[in-house]
Each structure stands twice: as structure tokens, then as C-alpha cells.
Amino acid sequence: MNVVTPNGGDSVAARSWPGLLNPLLRGEDLSAEETAWAMDRIMSGEATDAQIAGFAVALRAKGETVDEVTGLVRAMYAHANTIEVPGRTVDIVGTGGDLAKTVNISTMSAIVIAGTGAKVVKHGNRAASSASGSSDVLEKLGVNLELTPRRVVEVAEAAGITFCFAVKFHPALRYAAKARKELGAQTTFNILGPLTNPAQVRSQAVGVADARMAPIVAGVLADRGNSALVFRGDDGLDELTTTATSRVWVVRDGVVREEPFDPRDVGLPIVPVEALRGADASYNADVARRLLDGEAGAVREAVLLNSAAALVALDPGTGTLTEQLAAKILVAAEAIDSGAAKQALERWIAASNA
């Protein structure tokens, strides 16, 4: 079987699971074509649970490369329901897996970003490391997520923000669900969501809980020509966090540059993670409403910072990274304080339920 990838390349037909697993067990890297072949078999429903689990564990134990993850992403896109949203778009998302059970910072940030006038196409799913996932909270806020791909695009045009529910746009991932659940461990699959937005956005802010995977994610985005900020809190959060210092991988013009970041450098205090702790979807939705109504505190500060990260990815402006983030924090704060962010959510609710 040939695997036709989105960039037009074909993989070599004569491959086998032993031909991939044995090199991985010897610590040898695979090519993008080889991992694309494996993912194509998985997403076609032609791989057994044992083959899926063996591949996922062997790849993670060996340590993924940019080429290997790129191959997985290409195959996922080949099986995805992709969409085209006109104009410049941005996404903000975390990989999950930090086990911190925080409120939905990236989801609230997406609404704030839309309030600044940027067009947001968020890609998300049920809970990974938050107490509830982005989709759970958005449904509690009144956003209708049960939309066809065409309606998802229409909502983006009408409201300036839309949501791609992963299970609807990547239905072939169901073939890996049983093996992933039975493994119960973090594998490469956990970082593929942020790399496979169905709208193929070109600007992203991506939080990565796994320190080893953050530069890999940045490398994949760089190879695609995306503009992005990839980050990880030094305490393990998949956010540009206010609970600690962070590492940031700035992706621009095909180049990745790693920088340290301290929230105190933009005037934000370091707070305990308990200040960002969430609960169920109803609680987290209420936190979002209070944020949009102008409530001050640690949640607002974290949302402003992460909103700023996405705005920098979309349009960095001038100066150092710290200066860029400081400038965008002011833009995000104005979106909340003027009521524009709350209006963006109201437009989203109305458009998605029309």
C-alpha cells in the first residue's frame, strides 16, 4: 500500500511492523516515510492493538525525532477531515499530561484572543490534564460543538472564533483508542493533537508538559513554516505559566530559538499552582465567566500571559521576547476590560447555535 501524504510524497510500499519495531528496539531512528506508514496502518484500522501499543512504546522509549513526528502528522492529516478558514488564524493549545488539574487557561485565552480581533481556530478534546477539557467547558458556556466541518468554518467567519472537536475531525484515531487506554501511559500520541489542527493554522501557542518533547514539537512546526511559541513551565505545567519560570521555543522563519522566561519580567508575580486549580466543567465555566466580567487575580494573570503568547506568534512586533509579551499583555487586558472578550464569547454562542 502507498501512503499519500499531504505534501504529495509517497512512502515505500514494502514495509512491515517487524521492519519498524526491530530498529526502534535497537535505538535506531525511523524516517518520516516509515512513521507515516505506521500511522496510516493504524488509522486505516489495519493494525492490531498489540502492534499499536508496541509501536507507541518503542518509539517513546527510543525517543522521538522531528522527522518521526512529522511522518505521524502527515499521515494523520491524510486521514483527517480538514477545513479552510479564510484569513490569518491562530490556535492556542496544550498537550495535557501535566496532572495539575488547572482551570482551562488555553480555552479562556482563546476567547480573549478573539476579543482582540484575531481569528481563532481552536482544536481540542475532552480533558487531558485540566479538571475538565476545553470542549467540556465550552459546552457549559453554551457553545454548540456538534457542528459539521462546514458549520465550523461559518462560525469562524461569523464570530471570529471556532472550535474543531478532535473526535469529529480525526475520527480514524478511534482505532488507536483501545490500545492507548490500556497502556495508560504518555506516548507520542499525546503530542499529536496540537500539531494536527484541522484548519492547518500557521500561528500557534503550544504548551508541552513533556520537557523532552517541547523542542520536538517546535521543530515540527518550524519544518512546516509555522510561526509559534512553544513553552513549558519549569514546574512541568503545559502553559506559559505564572507558577514558575518557563522555557520558550520561539519558532519563526523555519528557525527555533530557545529562551528562558520569568513572568516577573513582565510584571506578573509567581503564584502557587493552587491559585490556578480547577474542578469540574461547571466550576471552570464559572471561572471563565468571572474572568470575562473583569475579575482580577491569578487566573486573569495566567490568561493574559498565554493570550499574549498566541498574539506574539501571530504578530510578534519588535523588541525582545519579553518586550513583545509585555506589549501583547496590554492588548489582551484591553480586550477583557473593554468587554470585547465577553462579546466574542456571546457572538460564538449565538453563531454556533444559529
Curated annotation (Swiss-Prot):
GO terms for molecular function: anthranilate phosphoribosyltransferase activity; magnesium ion binding. Anthranilate 1 binds at G94, N125. Its EC number is 2.4.2.18. Mg(2+) 1 binds at S106, E239. InterPro entries: Anthranilate_Pribosyl_Tfrase, Glycosyl_Trfase_fam3, Glycosyl_Trfase_fam3_N_dom, Glycosyl_Trfase_fam3_N_dom_sf, Nuc_phospho_transferase. Mg(2+) 2 binds at D238, E239. Its cofactor is Mg(2+). Pathway: Amino-acid biosynthesis; L-tryptophan biosynthesis; L-tryptophan from chorismate: step 2/5. Anthranilate 2 binds at R180. It comes from the Bacteria. 5-phospho-alpha-D-ribose 1-diphosphate binds at residues 94, 97-98, 102, 104-107, 122-130, 134. It catalyses: N-(5-phospho-beta-D-ribosyl)anthranilate + diphosphate = 5-phospho-alpha-D-ribose 1-diphosphate + anthranilate. Belongs to the anthranilate phosphoribosyltransferase family. Catalyzes the transfer of the phosphoribosyl group of 5-phosphorylribose-1-pyrophosphate (PRPP) to anthranilate to yield N-(5'-phosphoribosyl)-anthranilate (PRA). Homodimer. This is Anthranilate phosphoribosyltransferase. It comes from Streptomyces griseus subsp. griseus (strain JCM 4626 / CBS 651.72 / NBRC 13350 / KCC S-0626 / ISP 5235). The lineage of its organism: Bacteria, Bacillati, Actinomycetota, Actinomycetes, Kitasatosporales. The gene is trpD.
